[in-house]
Every structure is written in C-alpha cells, then in structure tokens.
C-alpha cells in the first residue's frame, strides 16, 4: 500500500455537501488538493499523494468516502 503524509481518508464526509467536504479535506491535510466531481465523471487513474477526489451526486452530496487516490 502507498504511504502519504497526513490524514488520507474522510468517511465522516459521506452525506455532506461536496464543497464543504472539499474544504474540510484541504483543512485537515494541507498536502492535498480536493477536487469535487459528479458521479460517473472521467478521472485519471494515476496515484497521487496530493489529490483527493470528492465524488458527489446531482444534489452535490458526497456519495463515497473521499480518500487520497
């Protein structure tokens, strides 16, 4: 498994607003940039310690655990 500095998963953000979740991720781990994407959006598969996808539904609600990916 890959190791990245700081917190790497935010299960407590499922069901929250995507924008609020992204701000929380970036506040809790200053090494990452949180990117809000709608479910089904194309995303790269390369692993990066500085990126967290925040996946939301059509209502802007987080639907899966944001984590470094």
Swiss-Prot record:
InterPro entries per UniProt: Prot_inh_pot1, Prot_inh_pot1_sf
PANTHER family for this protein: PROTEIN, PUTATIVE, EXPRESSED-RELATED, SERINE PROTEASE INHIBITOR, POTATO INHIBITOR I-TYPE FAMILY PROTEIN-RELATED
Keyword Methyltransferase: no
A Pfam family matched in the record: potato_inhibit
GO annotation terms (biological process): response to wounding
Source taxonomy: Eukaryota, Viridiplantae, Streptophyta, Embryophyta, Tracheophyta
Gene3D superfamilies linked to this entry: Trypsin Inhibitor V, subunit A
Residue(s) at site: Reactive bond: 45-46
Superkingdom: Eukaryota
Organism annotation: Linum usitatissimum
GO molecular function annotation: serine-type endopeptidase inhibitor activity
N-acetylserine: residues carrying this PTM: 1
Disulphide-bonded residues: 4-49
Record keywords, A-Z: Acetylation, Disulfide bond, Protease inhibitor, Serine protease inhibitor
Family (UniProt): Belongs to the protease inhibitor I13 (potato type I serine protease inhibitor) family.
SUPFAM superfamilies per UniProt: CI-2 family of serine protease inhibitors
Functional note: In vitro, strong inhibitor of bovine beta-trypsin, weak inhibitor of alpha-chymotrypsin, subtilisin BPN', subtilisin Carlsberg and cathepsin G.
Protein name per UniProt: Proteinase inhibitor
